[in-house]
UniProtKB/Swiss-Prot annotation:
Belongs to the ATPase alpha/beta chains family. GO terms for molecular function: ADP binding; ATP binding; proton-transporting ATP synthase activity, rotational mechanism. This is ATP synthase subunit alpha, chloroplastic. ATP binds at G170, D171, R172, Q173, T174, G175, K176, T177. It is a peripheral membrane protein. It comes from Pyropia yezoensis.
Length: 504
């Protein structure tokens, strides 16, 4: 019989115990109680954070939004068709964040910054939280540099500065996206990074935007974030925050950035859908009580940073769609009160052939005039006054049959001024040419030209300034003023064009 030596066995057991090294991984696990309509109710997950990312068995990602005593309300970032009742859910311990980097320029990504343009994964320089804090009061400085849109009516009367939030508001099909895209196209060569966020739009519309930016050579400095109409409500809700996070990466590197949210009405509707399905109490127009905070925390991230933080800026152009011109609805009034001004696009003006269809009377820029260049200030003040008087006279003259000569002259000048503000889509005008156009109009040089010929005259004047008198543009660009030398050149150009022009 073999002798069993207890000391040998005990030493073997001791060695086994000493070698035993099992890493214990503690996971926060819950169970799905109910799933449907892009919402899951989960039992367990005792240590979950608000806004934490959760992973389901089928690898779908969700966000914990409602933390209740007996369950957690989770919104899904996928269709959730393969999530079963009773399946497990794992807490990741992370708040939603996205990769960021210079390689994202020229790319089309989804709200989680995953590429959707079949060009491969962009190299990232790190990550940023989708929801990050807006810069504080001390970290900001007042708006002091212009953000030229290339649209004469806006740059002269409703100027936008870098770091401003300017709302573009109007009914559907009034040219809101066109104004935003023209602004992106006009940033070519200005060292501005643009981010276009498409929320709840048709994929065909987004494809159209991409191709028009590509044609104009503007895609190289633009990032497009697209949450299409068929995307889950959760992705439509986070898309604007993703756009802001991508822009913040460049802003904190000292760059000027421009973000367009097209449009925030769709984001509010997606958030309303999620809130109602989570059984949060509805408020006005069935929106949840925190829908103001939804937009204010997004738009407060736009800023002009002070020199210590690098002097970068984020300019926000949110778009809001109104119903039958009703700006007193809930979402429009909220966003108007958050932003630093609004550009109101009117359906009636659009249909009567005035494009861009900007209603100058109720459009306003609260801080942009501080950023306007001196040359534009010299001519724009008179333009706004003349147009306001013209609008008043035009309404009055519809009832009067015989008008005195002065009134007729004022009406004639007003019609010509309105004509010079018309502009084709995707053809932004440099600020020095805008100054020349307005100067020509307000100083009566167009009064003897037929209204139908004004556009042709302006086109010839721009050609003459560009080809025969390039020093005019150089002077205005370098001095930012309309100096007597430049004024003389402009007057000569007007005379030269008039000589060979058929006015009638």
């Amino acid at each position: 019989m073999v002798n069993i030596r207890p000391d040998e066995i005990s030493s073997i057991i001791r060695q086994q115990i000493e070698k035993y090294d099992q890493d214990v991984e503690v996971a926060n696990i819950g169970t799905v109680l109910q799933v449907g309509d892009g919402i899951a109710r989960v039992y367990g997950l005792d240590e979950v954070m608000a806004g934490e990312l959760l992973e389901f068995e089928d690898k779908t990602i969700g966000v914990a939004l409602n933390l209740e005593s007996d369950n957690v309300g989770v919104v899904l970032m996928g269709d959730g068709r393969d999530i079963l009742e009773g399946s497990s859910v794992k807490g990741t311990g992370r708040i939603a964040q996205i990769p960021v980097g210079d390689a994202f320029l020229g790319r089309v990504v989804d709200p989680l910054a995953r590429p959707i343009d079949d060009k491969g994964e962009p190299a990232s320089n790190g990550t940023r939280l989708i929801e990050s804090m807006a810069p504080g009061i001390i970290g900001r400085q007042s708006v002091c540099e212009p953000m030229q849109t290339g649209i004469t009516a806006i740059d002269s009367m409703i100027p936008i500065g870098r770091g401003q939030r300017e709302l573009i508001i109007g009914d559907r099909q009034t040219g809101k996206t066109a104004v935003a895209l023209d602004t992106i196209i006009n940033q070519k060569g200005q060292d501005v990074v643009c981010v276009y966020v498409a929320i709840g739009q048709k994929a065909s519309s987004v494809a159209q935007v991409v191709s028009s930016l590509q044609d104009k050579g503007a895609l190289d400095y633009t990032i497009i974030v697209a949450a299409n109409a068929d995307s889950p409500a959760t992705l439509q809700y986070i898309a604007p925050y993703t756009g802001a996070a991508l822009a913040e990466y460049f802003m904190y590197k000292g760059k000027a950035t421009l973000v367009i949210y097209d449009d925030l009405t769709k984001q509010a509707q997606a958030y309303r859908q999620m809130s109602l399905l989570l059984r949060r109490p509805p408020g006005r127009e069935a929106y949840p009580g925190d829908v103001f905070y939804l937009h204010s925390r997004l738009l407060e991230r736009a800023a002009k940073l002070n020199a210590e933080l690098g002097g970068g800026s984020m300019t926000a152009l949110p778009i809001i769609e109104t119903q039958a011109g009703d700006v007193s609805a809930y979402i429009p009034t909220n966003v108007i009160s958050i932003t630093d001004g609004q550009i109101f696009l009117s359906g009636d003006l659009f249909n009567s052939g005035i494009r861009p269809a900007i209603n100058v009377g109720i459009s306003v820029s609260r801080v942009g005039s501080a950023a306007q260049i001196k040359a534009m200030k010299q001519v724009a003040g008179k333009l706004k006054l003349e147009l306001a008087q013209f609008a008043e006279l035009e309404a009055f003259s519809q009832f009067a049959s015989d008008l005195d000569k002065a009134t007729q002259n004022q009406l004639a000048r007003g019609q010509r001024l309105r004509e010079i503000l018309k502009q084709a889509q995707n053809s932004p005008i440099p600020v020095e040419e805008q100054t020349a156009i307005i100067y020509t109009g307000i100083n009566g040089y167009l009064d003897d030209i037929e209204v139908s010929k004004v556009a042709e005259f302006i086109r010839e004047l721009r050609e003459d300034l560009k080809n025969s008198k390039p020093e005019f543009g150089e002077n205005v660009r370098s001095t930012k003023k309309l100096e007597p030398v430049s004024e003389e050149l402009l007057k000569r150009a007007i005379e030269d064009v008039k000589q060979g022009f058929d006015k009638a």
